[in-house]
């Protein structure tokens, strides 16, 4: 994976500092704070991300926290990143710390970080709501610890309509999915939520810490397809061809 080891450490103060308190003037306006979950999964919605974001960027943003899985939401038809993702943490303290990143500036974007709202399922298990018209799968991971199903939803309470059309997501962004058969739908968040987002003023922007990525050290994608014209065995030739040449 490309090297993304340096976000500005000044942006990572302890809970309640640096990035603007939730619901304060430095945040996204007046909002009702959600209760932290008392049992897994401990999942955060992260929105308003640059469209060239990759998993390594998310790992770097939350590098000091205990991340279990990352799900980058992509358009079903174009496979383009839609500007938001879901990050599950191993314990509630990491989720609590992640919430303090809400309002931090990444380039000219003000990050949105919130608790992904969960709801109990009729048949057991725990799901998330993030409304949308269609169901999309989000499977694939390393260290499998529970399946990902698409029949239930995710909801963060943010309005991401400007991030693009509805669509699905590409499987297998990072590690295992949440336990107890959690399920997802990855369309834009529900309207009419209990949180309102407003763009920060210039004064507020000046007070917020800025997150900066170093250039990626790997210029060529690691999963790039090999050149089909390249010789698999270098300059080696079949044995029959070698014998024929010696006889000549």
Curated annotation (Swiss-Prot):
One GO location term (cellular component): perinuclear region of cytoplasm
Biased composition (Gly residues): 15-29
Region called Disordered, residue ranges: 1-41, 121-248
Domain called RRM: residue spans: 42-118
Name the record gives this protein: Eukaryotic translation initiation factor 4H
Membrane-spanning residues: none
Any one Gene Ontology BP term: sexual reproduction
Residue positions where Omega-N-methylarginine is found in the record: 19, 22, 136, 166, 175
UniProt key word RNA-binding: yes
Biased composition (Basic and acidic residues): 131-163, 196-207, 237-248
InterPro entries noted in UniProt: eIF4H_RRM (IPR034229), Nucleotide-bd_a/b_plait_sf (IPR012677), RBD_domain_sf (IPR035979), RRM_dom (IPR000504)
Positions where N-acetylalanine occurs in the chain: 2
Origin superkingdom: Eukaryota
Regions of compositional bias (Polar residues) in chain numbering: 220-230
Modified residues (Phosphoserine): 13-14, 21, 24, 32, 230
Keywords: Acetylation, Cytoplasm, Initiation factor, Methylation, Phosphoprotein, Protein biosynthesis, RNA-binding
Gene name in the database record: Eif4h
GO molecular function, one term: translation initiation factor activity
Record function comment: Stimulates the RNA helicase activity of EIF4A in the translation initiation complex. Binds weakly mRNA.
Organism: Rattus norvegicus (Rat)
Localization per record: Cytoplasm, Perinuclear region
